[in-house]
Structure formats: structure tokens, C-alpha cells
Amino acid sequence: MNNNTTCIQPSMISSMALPIIYILLCIVGVFGNTLSQWIFLTKIGKKTSTHIYLSHLVTANLLVCSAMPFMSIYFLKGFQWEYQSAQCRVVNFLGTLSMHASMFVSLLILSWIAISRYATLMQKDSSQETTSCYEKIFYGHLLKKFRQPNFARKLCIYIWGVVLGIIIPVTVYYSVIEATEGEESLCYNRQMELGAMISQIAGLIGTTFIGFSFLVVLTSYYSFVSHLRKIRTCTSIMEKDLTYSSVKRHLLVIQILLIVCFLPYSIFKPIFYVLHQRDNCQQLNYLIETKNILTCLASARSSTDPIIFLLLDKTFKKTLYNLFTKSNSAHMQSYG
């Protein structure tokens, strides 16, 4: 048996806990996101740009959920499969493609939602005397586009096209070229977990994407706070407190999502690529375990998003409430 294979040994966390967690996340995520998509597509008549962003976010979430069974079976059976077996290739290709493509799409869409929420604030204040000429021009020529449903629809389609156009060739290259160059005997091995040169470069670019998304959200929140302070020193904003509170809540929710789910992953990934080059099997196993746990944490956001939608969109919350209220009323009447 190859040295690289024997060096990588899955712990109970990888072989037992992660498969169970991925299956549970898949069940919760498929149910919640399918219900959310049904509401967005059939129950909400007049769709705003936020609804379009959230609908595409749900699509990305469902794609992540579709990868979870592959990830689960990989961690459960990967140490028993042969490296060149069909099931190893299929799980590796579909799991990697679905997981990473949809994660990057989700990140970009969350960034656009943050910009859209800030644009809502600027729309409310673009006619105020306290708004600078720069802010009026910035809103008039750029920000307001993020609130236009047509622009939101086209932007989301472009995002899917660009991300898939990058991820698919990298995944195919890794599966066809890089994955066949190693001498590993088992599916769960060093090369599968670490990736080769091209896939590592792609991983670092992906980490940069996460940093970019986080920067966009932080910038939106900082701009919001700065704008709010300026407005408060110049005029009364009591009549607009609800709008400001709503925008602040949305930006905070997105910030928390990125901090909890994606920030640990993005911080650890460069460290992982630097430290894994040392010939220390115990340290390598710890690094791989940590990477897999943080990847699972990042993908968990896709399953919890339907709860987040209740905080991001009042129409979705109201529609869901009415749906369950009517359902309960009909159920009570049938027993009346």
C-alpha cells in the first residue's frame, strides 16, 4: 500500500460524524429550500430584485444539498473504494463541482443583496439636501441598478455562467488529468484531499472570492453607518427609522452568515496549503480533519438559509405565515 495512502487515516469524525451531518443537512436543506423556491415562484406575485436574488440563492443552495449525499458516501466509504473506481470518480467529480460552484454563486449573490439593501437606503435619501453630489451620482448611475428586477435577473445569470465556466474546466482537468497521475490505491487519499497544483490554485482563487464578498458586505455596512451618522447630525430621521432598521438588520444578517460559515474556512485554507507540505502524518491528518469540518460548516449555510429568508424579506415571511395559517385553519375545520 502506498505511503501517501497509509499516512492519511480518517478519524471517527470523518468516517461517522460527517456522513451523518451531511445527510441531516441534506434533508433539512432540500425541504426548506424547495418550500422557499415554491413560495418565490408561485406565491409571490410582484417580484422585487431581492426576490430574484433569493430565488437564485435557493437554486445554489439546492445544488449544494445535491452534493451532500456524495460527500456523505465519500467520507463513509472512501477509505474502502479503489482510487480508480467509477464510484470514486463520480463522487469526486459531482461532489466537487456541485459544492464549489454553488458556494461561489451563493457568496456573490449575498454580496449583491448587501449592495441592493444599501441601494434601498440611498433611494430613500437621494433627494435629501444632506446627500452629497457624489452619493447622488453613485446611486443614480450604479447602485439603483441592483434594485431593478431586470438587472438582478441578468446579473444572476452572468454569475452562474462565469462561475460554471471556471469551475467545470478545473474540475474536469482535475478528474481526467491530475487525479490519474498519482499512485494512490484508495479513494480517500492525500491527493484527493489536498488537490494537485491547478486545483490548489483554483482553491486559493476561491478563497479570494470569499474575501471579496466579505469586503463588499463590510463596505456596505460601513457606508450605511457613516451615512446614518451624517443624517442624524443634520435632520430628524424618525419617519425613516423602520427603513434604516430594516437595512441594518439585513446587512448584519449577511455579515453574521459570512463570519460564522465562510470566514473560518477562508482563513484556514491558505494556512492549510502552506502547512500540508510538511512530512508529518499526524499534523496532516489534523489539517485535513479541520478542512473537512470547516467545509461542512460552510455548506451548512445552504440548509439554514430558509430561516434567514424570514429575516431578509418581509413578503416571504408574510406568505409563509399565511400559508401555514390557512393550512391550520383548514385542518381545524375538518375536525370541527
From Swiss-Prot:
The biological process GO terms on file are: adipose tissue development; energy homeostasis; response to food; response to glucose; response to insulin; triglyceride metabolic process
- Mind telling me which Pfam families this protein's record contains? 7tm_1
Look up the signal peptide feature and give its range.
Answer: none
Which Gene Ontology terms cover its molecular function? Answer: G protein-coupled receptor activity
| Stretches in topological domain Cytoplasmic | 33-55, 116-156, 219-251
Q: Does the keyword Transmembrane helix apply?
A: yes
Q: Which UniProt keywords apply?
A: Cell membrane, G-protein coupled receptor, Glycoprotein, Membrane, Receptor, Transducer, Transmembrane, Transmembrane helix
Sum up the protein's function in the record's words. Answer: Orphan receptor.
The UniProt entry lists the main location of this chain as membrane
Q: Which residues cross the membrane?
A: 12-32, 56-76, 93-115, 157-177, 198-218, 252-272
Give the organism the record lists. Answer: Homo sapiens (Human)
Task: Write down the glycosylated positions.
Answer: 3-4
Q: What is the lineage of its organism?
A: Eukaryota, Metazoa, Chordata, Craniata, Vertebrata
Its membrane topology is listed as: Multi-pass membrane protein
Among InterPro entries, the record links this protein to: GPCR_Rhodpsn (IPR000276), GPCR_Rhodpsn_7TM (IPR017452), GPR82 (IPR042804)
Record carries keyword Cell membrane: yes
Family label: Belongs to the G-protein coupled receptor 1 family.
User: According to its UniProt record, where is this protein located?
Assistant: Cell membrane
What protein am I looking at? Probable G-protein coupled receptor 82
Q: Which residues lie on this side of the membrane: Extracellular?
A: 1-11, 77-92, 178-197, 273-336
Q: Which GO terms describe its cellular component?
A: plasma membrane
